């Protein structure tokens, strides 16, 4: 265990295999083929509009005339994800379904030259750093090394920032990026709170970028600069999360330096 993490973090060792973003497409295709070959039917361009949990019917609208607008079911696995959480809340209220609030999970993506983390990478490619307080815990996740890039994705009408790493070393840039995820307990309506926090973090739907050393935003694997708004200080983070919560993230980063 590298000496520099002992005062601040816990290190847990798990087996890790790096697939690479460039090879993940093939795994997705194989997974899809396996399911369809075994009788699973995917309904694309289809939106569920209502679920009757009493009589076991699903209503949906589809651009594909092959599918009916109503279908019955014997068993239902209901998973809406974050994009469908409002729909899930509507159904829970309509049918008086029991729900449980979960802690808020929100964070930032951090990027730095890889040599700063090489001791950890030599132990585990996707190393995990943890730090815990009374009602808040922080952890690193989704670590990318060697040929590591930040990519912008459109999520709910705003930009979100994801890390990618290619297996093909012709793309090598010797950078490391990972998310710093903060879990906050005791917040009423956690998804609404986090959605508002993201809006405050962004400017015109685009994420903000801050570098204390005035580094320019990184490039994507296609050679384009990552779309973002460069800011001069941490005020957007303070405004979005509150000074106390923002300082937890700042302290997490300082403990790595």
What are these regions (language model features)?
Residues 1-257:
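Residues forming the flavin
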